[in-house]
Curated annotation (Swiss-Prot):
This is Large ribosomal subunit protein uL4. It comes from the Bacteria. One of its GO terms (cellular component) is ribosome. GO terms for molecular function: rRNA binding; structural constituent of ribosome. One of the primary rRNA binding proteins, this protein initially binds near the 5'-end of the 23S rRNA. It is important during the early stages of 50S assembly. It makes multiple contacts with different domains of the 23S rRNA in the assembled 50S subunit and ribosome. Forms part of the polypeptide exit tunnel. Part of the 50S ribosomal subunit. Keywords: Ribonucleoprotein, Ribosomal protein, RNA-binding, rRNA-binding. Belongs to the universal ribosomal protein uL4 family. Residues 62-71 have a biased composition (Basic residues).
Amino acid sequence: MEVNIINVNSDRIGTIDLNPLIFSVNYRPDILKMVVDWQLSKRRAGTHKAKTIGDISGTTAKPHRQKHTGRARQGSLRSPQFRGGAVIFGPVVRSHAYSLNKKVRNLGLKVALSLKNSCNKLLILDSIDVNFVKTTQVLQFIKNFEHKSFLIIDKDYNKSVVCSCRNLHNVTLLKQIGTNVLDILRHDCIILTVGAVKYLEERLL
C-alpha cells in the first residue's frame, strides 16, 4: 500500500509502502472495545474505600442485654443498621487491572491504525526533530488540515519538540513505544513519522 510522505509545508516529497497487515486490517469494533476497556481499567486508581466494622472507632460493648427488653437483639453499635455504622460489601482499595492477551492488544492497534487510514486521517511526515522547533511552526503545519485534534507519533524526539507542542491543546506528542488504541481513537488525525512507521512494523509483525 503506497502512501505519500509530506513535509511540514504539506508538500509531497515521496512515497512509502505501508504493510497491509497493519494498516489495512478489517474493522473489528469488538476488539477495539476490549482493548479500550483494558486500558481504562489499568488507568483507574482504585483508591475507593468504605469502612468495615473493624475500621470504625467506638465502643465494642453490647448496647443492651440479650433478652427481656422487647427490642431486637444487638451486638454492636458499629453494625451497619446504626447511624455511623459500617458498610457491608463496600468498595475496598484494589487494582482494577487485568491481563489481556498480547495478540489481542496488537490486533487492536492494527485495527485502530487501519481505521484512521481508511478514513484518510493518517498522515506520514518525514521528520519532526528539525522542523518542529517553535510552537508557531507546529501551529502553521496543523492549520493546513481541517482536523480537530492531532496525535504525532515519532520513534524519538528531543526537548525542543516537546516544548513546541505542549502549549497546543489539540496536539499530543507520543513516542512510538507508547502508541496505544485509546489515544489513536481519541484524536481526529494521526501523524506518523517515517521512523515511527518502521518501528511499528517491527513491533507488530
